[in-house]
Amino acid sequence: MHRLVALDVDGTLLDPAHNLSARTQAAIHAAQRNGVTIALATGKLLASVQPLLADLRLSGTHITCNGAALMAAATGAPVATWSLSDAQVELALAAIHTLAPEMAIAWYTTDAIYTDSPWSQLDETLAAYHEPPLRHVARLDHTLPPPLKFLMTGDHARLLCLRDALRERIGSAVTVVRTTSDFVEVMAPGVSKGVALRDLAARLAIPCEAIVAIGDGENDIALLDEAGLGIAMGNAMPALLPHAQQTTQSNAEDGVARALERLGLA
């Protein structure tokens, strides 16, 4: 019996224009009426998905910052966090500055995003993903709240090269992932949506075999691996497909709604 559904947001729950379709909204409402717990599993801040939580009538706890935080929807407070240590921050920033000195860096905390760069492509791209405005500071250092992750954006081919170079240089000390074609992100070692899902499921006393996870990106691999049933979107990155037991239609075709309907949850 499926008791918990974990849903990636961009590229999965939302359509290509970052909107929630009526069919998907109705399917999630139906699943909740059928006793299924719905948890979002996003790379974004909780504040960025609060309007979505309201539209879906979701409370409870949700996975944010690619698994670096569990956040309570009702209060906006962290339930659990896995931040980068001072040593990991120093290592990661040095590597990014060496390998991609032209790229702006976003420093994510539980409730804000900081950068030491002037207005740039980073601001524009994150705005398109409905993230809150970046807080521009003089420098990224220990005077800021501990970071849950670092994020970089840029040319897609350049990002792919950066991901591989960062993994080669510091991959034994931190987690490096390409979350969408737009982003490369750095988190503490062992941090993933899958680890956060395991923690959330334990808090809810739900066994992994009763979990369905749906996603489309490289950062959803661990999410699908942790669930009893992993479903890849029709628009999923090729790297995700070997980790899915099922596929559904793309996010332009109400893939989440169709998956929930086929499972008899909606």
Predicted segments — roles?
Residues 1-4, 20-21, 185-266:
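Mg2+-dependent phosphoryl-transfer enzymes with acidic/Ser/Thr/Gly-rich catalytic loops
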Residues 35-39, 58-60, 148-149, 209-211, ...:
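Short active-site oxyanion
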Residues 99-214, 218, 226:
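Conserved acidic, metal-coordinating active-site core of Asp-based
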Residues 8:
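Active-site residues of response regulator receiver
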Residues 24, 49-53, 162, 166, ...:
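Hydrophobic packing residues within well-ordered alpha-helices of enzyme cores
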Residues 56-58, 65-66, 74, 170-172, ...:
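Short, structured coil segments at secondary-structure junctions
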Residues 19-122:
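Active-site phosphate-binding/coordination module
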